[in-house]
Curated annotation (Swiss-Prot):
PROSITE patterns: OMPR_PHOB, RESPONSE_REGULATORY. The modification 4-aspartylphosphate is found at residue 51. This is Transcriptional regulatory protein QseB. Residues 2-116 form the Response regulatory domain. Keywords: Cytoplasm, DNA-binding, Phosphoprotein, Transcription, Transcription regulation, Two-component regulatory system. Residues 124-218 bind DNA. Phosphorylated by QseC. GO terms for cellular component: cytosol; protein-DNA complex. One of its GO terms (molecular function) is phosphorelay response regulator activity. Member of a two-component regulatory system QseB/QseC. One of its GO terms (biological process) is regulation of DNA-templated transcription. It comes from Haemophilus influenzae (strain ATCC 51907 / DSM 11121 / KW20 / Rd). PANTHER family: REGULATOR OF RPOS, TRANSCRIPTIONAL REGULATORY PROTEIN QSEB. Its main location: cytoplasm.
Amino acid sequence: MRILLIEDDNLIGNGLQIGLTKLGFAVDWFTDGKTGMAALTSAPYDAVVLDLTLPKLDGLEVLQQWRSNHQDVPVLILTARDTLDERVKGLQSGADDYLCKPFALAEVAARLQALIRRRYGYHHSVIEQAGVKLDQNQRSVWLNNQPISLTSREYKLLELFMLNKDRVLSRSSIEEKLSSWDEEISSGALDVHIYNLRQKLGKQFIRTVHGVGYALGQVEK
């Protein structure tokens, strides 16, 4: 899943980018409010981690402008502003969650996963589809109650398909969702990952919708 991170503290921002990437997220990091606000429309982000005390444009103003422009991406405020009034104001301005610094990386990741699941209509960390069970907390996959070994890329690709079980995904949208600006997924690599998933989960589990992209097997053209 692709995350937009707006944080001006280099130590915190670098730690979040590295840590969340290791946990399977693709992370684009910006250090000021003005650039971060503009970045939201540049890629299909699944969620935003937003600091409030930012140079050039305050994080609360960034959030308010997004919401006034009908940008509905889930936003997790991550800030040192910890008073009750500030937390209430952040949530009333359109934030979906609010977490105060200092924080634990595991909690940030768990909150992001919960926000993204809700966006796609799921309320549990275990997603099941056609005999395949994906556990986001354990990052494990089971087929007919048997564990399946996947690479990190294969897991992220499978997670994307299962969260979008009723949608056809184009090649470009898959590549954008799974990579940050600091990395790219080549078209050939995507073909290899899809081939490997079909070998492990069944050839019909991921269907090619000719001229459009890919979908889980039960999705109609």
